[in-house]
Amino acid sequence: MSIPVNATVRAVPNFLACLQAARSFMDTQNASSAPARFKKLQAEVLKARALLSFAPASGRPARFLDAKSGWGQFQAEQARQLAREFGRPELRELVLAHHVVLYAHSQRDVVLLCMRNERPLAYRLPKPSA
């Protein structure tokens, strides 16, 4: 039995903007069911936070890092640069029920970078510092 890592998990402002965008989309899609669906998403994020605190490498390798298209390669490089800015060498994705969370991590620290719905291919990444 392995000992829990108890890594620090934090979110950057862009991740919070992604949560707000998800809420706005839910409101647009169906205003009456949006509060319940958003509450479910929040619960999934809290559960993901607990999992990543226990095992930072729980997610799958970020698939878009091997993109072949020009746009995909651009986004992959943007994400790598963002991870380097936070000093976290690994980029991974954690799949929730209908969303995918992109995060950077080391053994003791996890940074939630952004989140997207399961359908779109692209993440809404912030611009890295120059």
Language-model-detected regions and their locations in the chain:
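Basic, Lys/Arg-enriched alpha-helical interface segments
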Residues: 1-90, 128-130
